[in-house]
């Protein structure tokens, strides 16, 4: 995610001191605090990197220390406290501070008394001391798998964004091809994932198809998704572009971004917002005939030049929701006109052109006054009739 390269150095090479060193302790190196395993024991600590290459300003600069008496430090697992601790302390060694001017050595800081701003929580930064619940997240006790959105922004400010990170077509979540366990979901076991994505290119996907809970997936950068039973537990870093999203078997809400998205709701009654761009939308068919909703908030979201394709519409079951155009495009009503007839120049005219041979429908609409051509279009695989359209 940043222009930092880690190369392991032999611990016996005293002539070429590593920039960052890791070690266990039973007493702090400066002798100030004894280690232990009780409630007041120091769990881990680290020193900031040296201000000069020689590191002569601090003999401990760039060193990271873990309490040997904490058994979980010897075998950390993604999502547990020790894994979070390792990432937190490494953040210090790279130059990251706590979001506020607090520290365990200064007492027992609290969100109410010491948070410098609202987002100072583990939802936004693994460098925070404060539970993600303070900012509305619920990770079911799962700690961040790695750096979170604010950590990514901070480390990129210090070292620059790495534009070679996963430039191919990358899948995050289920069916992941990242080769990273902290960006992968493997089971619907009641423990949701908790990670932030940085991606530098390609055509990429958030895949949460293995979950059965109700989910909300948001592809906008800087936004959080609620997946696998968690709340706001997956984020996309600022500046990262993820094009596609796949939901699970529950009732999912999927929100696209300004790219050409592929959104798939899968089973369950799903709500899909394609947003801008020429999107391909699958509600997902299943034996229970659940209703899928394809929602449009503005006529710019599916134009004649760059129109959406709804790939699996079921007449009498699914709905196309155009009510957002009432407010954002000042349309007071829809006026259906016959297939193939000319637009009269009155905005709000809508036409459904069904191709029986191919089994497709083109939904065309004029949203401009004194215009005699459609400016809004959706191509639908399936038959669409007036009763399938919502405009409340």
Functional labels for PLM-detected ranges:
Residues 216-244, 284-300:
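Acidic/polar low-complexity surface segments
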Residues 139-192, 201, 205, 210-216, ...:
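Extracytoplasmic and endomembrane cell-envelope/extracellular-matrix remodeling and assembly machinery
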Residues 17, 201, 210-212, 221, ...:
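Extracellular, beta-strand-rich repeat scaffolds characterized by small/acidic residue-biased motifs
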Residues 76-85, 142-149, 236:
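Soluble non-cytosolic domains of exported or imported proteins
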